[in-house]
Each structure stands twice: as C-alpha cells, then as structure tokens.
C-alpha cells in the first residue's frame, strides 16, 4: 500500500494432509502429501516435538477427487494415544491431530445438535443453540400450488435445509434414515445431548428423528399417499 506497511503474503496451503479430528488406535491411518519430492515423514509429539514414528510415502499417483498428484503414507501400526503432527520434508508440517478412543464423541454431539438448531416451527433456545437461537417460525398454513380448490395445509415443523429456510421430504428422509442407522449401530443409550427432549427415556437420536418424521407425515397427501 502506498505510504503504509506492506501487506503480509497470503498463507500457504497445508500440503501435508491428515484427518484433523484424528484416528482411533486401530483405525487405518493415512497421510497424504501433495508433493512429488517428499520421500519420508515422521510423527512428532505436538507438545514435546519428540519423534514417535518414521514412515515412507508410496509412489506418486493421480488422485481424481483432489485433482492433484499425491503420495500416500501409511502409519496404521502407530497406535499410541496422544496429540501429534506430521513433519514431511520439504513440504512442512500437518495440522495437529489426535489418536484416541473418544475422538468422535464431540463430533457426534455437534452433528445431532446441528439438527436441533435447524428446527422449524418451534423456538430454538439460546442456552442450547447459542447464536443459532430463534423464535418459532413458518407457522402459517401453506398453499398447495396446482390445486385449484385453494387448499392450504399445515407444514410447520421439520428441519431447515442447506443453510436456508427450505424444507424437503427427500433430503429429510435420507437424514432420518442416517439417524436410524446411527441409532442401530451406536446410539441405544445416547440421551444426553441436551436437547429439550433429553431425559425422557427415549434416545435423543430417535427424538430428533421423530421431529422430522412428524413434519413428513404432514407433507403426505391423505388421498394419494404421495408427498408434497
């Protein structure tokens, strides 16, 4: 800038890629580097910089999803719980990541609470949703377009979708399916997410799924069985 300080250079993208949440001890663990020059990598303790593991990258290959040439390094055999980063020369360091058994507890809660924050047709409270809190919304009846009789139906409820106020049966049904699968696999006892229904002796995953299902039933035409 004329007469001012020079702007700092833009930050360089991290070239050493890991799962930033981390890995369970027995998970397959892979590091990816977007450079042809890196041959080896080392895992260092994030607090002490002590080298904990040394590994080698495989051959350079094209990753279609990344649209880039990459090299993969495997560190599955390293299982020690802790917080680490990977140093790779000449590309630099990865973000910090962890190895442990409870890594996904907070992620699970964040995902399900996100659905609560997207609830439509009810107050979403600040003590649970923070900045996403809002009053009950979209409570008015909606016109069925294409129906010449002027039919209006109650479509309150469900989840807002995709960062706006749209609500859709198809994407809602897929999300409900995912909640049911998560319940079958992991969630029979999960009743501590802090949503209004918590503590009602029904797992919170099912409570959240029911909130969407109640809306989906409103979206079903009684005569044809089809959905709006």
Where are these regions (language model features)?
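N-terminal Sec signal peptide cleavage junction
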Residues: 1-2
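Low-complexity, Pro/Ser/Thr- and charge-rich linker/hinge segments at domain boundaries
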Residues: 5-12, 16, 94-129
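Ligand-binding face of N-terminal immunoglobulin V-set domains in extracellular IgSF glycoproteins
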Residues: 15-102
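Extracellular structured ligand-interaction cores
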Residues: 38, 70, 81-83, 94, ...
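Catalytic cores of eukaryotic secretory-pathway lumenal/extracellular enzymes that build
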Residues: 44-46, 52, 58-61, 111, ...
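Acidic/aromatic-lined carbohydrate-recognition and catalytic surfaces
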Residues: 65, 77, 93-109, 189-208, ...
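Well-ordered alpha-helical scaffold segments within catalytic/enzyme domains
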Residues: 88, 176-197, 212-219
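Extended ligand-binding groove/face enriched in aromatic
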Residues: 110, 114-171, 195-228
């Amino acid at each position: 800038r004329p007469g001012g300080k020079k702007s700092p250079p833009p930050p360089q993208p991290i070239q050493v890629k890991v799962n930033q949440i981390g890995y369970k001890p027995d998970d397959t663990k892979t590091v990816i580097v977007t450079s042809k020059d890196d041959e080896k990598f080392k895992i260092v303790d994030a607090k002490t910089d002590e080298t904990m593991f040394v590994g080698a990258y495989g051959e350079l290959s094209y990753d279609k999803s990344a649209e880039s040439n990459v090299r993969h390094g495997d560190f599955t055999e390293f299982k020690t719980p802790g917080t680490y980063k990977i140093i790779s020369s000449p590309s630099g360091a990865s973000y910090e990541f962890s190895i442990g058994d409870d890594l996904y507890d907070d992620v699970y809660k964040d995902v399900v609470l996100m659905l609560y924050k997207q609830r439509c047709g009810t107050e979403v409270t600040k003590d649970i949703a923070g900045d996403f809190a809002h009053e009950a919304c979209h409570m008015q009846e909606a016109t069925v377009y294409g129906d010449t009789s002027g039919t209006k139906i109650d479509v309150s409820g469900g989840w807002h979708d995709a960062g706006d106020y749209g609500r859709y049966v198809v994407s809602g049904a897929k999300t409900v399916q995912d909640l049911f699968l998560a319940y079958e696999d992991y969630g029979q006892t999960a009743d501590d997410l802090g949503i209004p229904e918590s503590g009602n002796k029904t797992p919170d995953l099912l409570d959240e799924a029911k909130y969407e299902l109640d809306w989906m039933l409103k979206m079903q035409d009684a005569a044809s069985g089809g959905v709006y």
